[in-house]
Amino acid sequence: MSRDPILSLPWPDARPLPDTFFDRDALLVARELLGKVIRHRQGNLWLAARIIETEAYYLEEKGSHASLGYTEKRKALFLDGGHIYMYYARGGDSLNFSAGGPGNAVLIKSGHPWLDRISDHTALERMQSLNPDSQGRPREIGRLCAGQTLLCKAMGLKVPEWDAQRFDPQRLFVDDVGERPSQVIQAARLGIPKGRDEHLPYRFVDATFAAFCTRNPLRRGQVAGRDYHLLGHQDPHLQ
């Protein structure tokens, strides 16, 4: 059942994305998620991260989990847009949202801690305690959510709790805080095995935060037009 319109807000000016936002083409959803903020409630704290890197996946291409077929574990991919799909990657939790069309989804690849009156420095300290560095020290802010498993660890998001669930505005949702990237980088996805559509340009990065994503697409040796494309706010993305 659709939950539009959202009737139960956690605070008066919260703007949870409705299911209709997600129930669209995965590339469009992936790009437009940049700048949105994931909020997860832990006790009386709202942990928050701005989405800075996403990847789109489709049923009919070989890089997706859905291309391997329907299973109970993958059922969220085949539900309507706005369901949460979580799985384990390299031993850590990963967060995805189902998009329009069975089997299509968006992976939340990286985030950056978000601070405001709702999610303050106390919430940030909780995130750092959840995701310390290898020496047990607070991880620097720019690296705290710089990868799909680091993001989930810092946000306290776990597969058993959230896989195949819908958003809950009182516990976990994506907030539209009015931020829009001035430039977006489009490039090939990361970690796709050779021969499984690794060339498809289905990765999006907020250019302002390129240095804080999984792997900087603007690093030395990368060439515009060959390794990535830089899109302005009004520029159409590559299909």
Curated annotation (Swiss-Prot):
Class of the enzyme per the UniProt entry, highest EC level: hydrolase
Its keywords, alphabetically, are: DNA damage, DNA repair, Hydrolase
One MF annotation (Gene Ontology) recorded for this entry: DNA binding
Question: Matching Gene3D superfamilies, A to Z?
Answer: Methylpurine-DNA glycosylase (MPG) (3.10.300.10)
InterPro entries, alphabetically? Answer: Formyl_transferase-like_C_sf (IPR011034), MPG (IPR003180), MPG_sf (IPR036995)
Which family, according to UniProt? Belongs to the DNA glycosylase MPG family.
| PANTHER family documented for this protein | DNA-3-METHYLADENINE GLYCOSYLASE
Q: What is this protein identified as?
A: Putative 3-methyladenine DNA glycosylase
| Origin organism lineage | Bacteria, Pseudomonadati, Pseudomonadota, Gammaproteobacteria, Pseudomonadales
